[in-house]
């Protein structure tokens, strides 16, 4: 697969066509139907949930062919991003920013989460293709795909929005997927803890992660 190198802009000024995680002040837990309480520690570009939201992670498939389960988001912080390999701009740019953020975090001594890229286009994002795509950015990043109903269920739990945009050509497979542009942070218990909002920058991500960790009581 040939993936063009992505130049990282100083500021990533893209939002997925208005699709976000929530309408300000109205983020609901789909499991309970109750409104989430939000806090914004200094330095965080986004919101934290108080308390963190329990997530039932379904069994999906990693880019290397092995199973991805709830155990894969426990014991460490996780940064989860929903996208797809045919995404023309938001996905490759966000992944490239995450690569730079990881490097910056290492120089600053900041714990960086494990990155998980969840495909919102499982019909086209086959396992091997997804593994190659994600591995292009960082071999330690994890690509995840699987049954569309299971991905839908995971996305709903995490307040992620996405929808297929029909092709404007004669090729029905030449479609795009509009999707949320934010990054989700799960704590070492596997609970949804925070939303990092676009536009993303390496410094913004690192500062946000540090703010979240500092604001989270030790287990």
Residue locations for each model-derived region?
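Thiol/disulfide oxidoreductase modules built on the thioredoxin-like
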Residues: 150-208
């Amino acid at each position: 697969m040939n993936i063009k190198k992505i130049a990282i802009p100083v500021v990533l000024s893209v939002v997925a066509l208005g699709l976000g995680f929530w309408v300000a002040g109205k983020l609901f837990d789909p499991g309970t139907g109750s409104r989430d309480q939000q806090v914004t520690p200094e330095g965080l570009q986004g919101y934290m949930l108080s308390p963190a939201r329990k997530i039932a992670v379904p069994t999906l498939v990693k880019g290397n062919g092995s199973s991805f389960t709830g155990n894969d988001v426990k014991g460490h912080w996780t940064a989860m991003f929903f996208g797809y390999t045919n995404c023309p701009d938001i996905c490759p740019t966000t992944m490239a920013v995450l690569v730079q953020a990881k490097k910056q975090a290492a120089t600053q001594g900041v714990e960086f989460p494990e990155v998980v890229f969840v495909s919102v286009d499982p019909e086209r994002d086959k396992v091997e293709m997804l593994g190659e795509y994600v591995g292009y950015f960082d071999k330690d990043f994890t690509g995840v795909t699987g049954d569309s109903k299971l991905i839908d269920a995971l996305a709903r739990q995490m307040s992620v929005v996405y929808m297929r945009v029909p092709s404007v050509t004669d090729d029905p497979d030449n479609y795009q997927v509009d999707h949320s542009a934010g990054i989700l942070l799960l704590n070492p218990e596997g609970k949804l803890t925070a939303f990092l909002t676009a536009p993303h920058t390496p410094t913004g991500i690192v500062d946000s992660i540090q703010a979240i960790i500092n604001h989270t009581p030790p287990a």
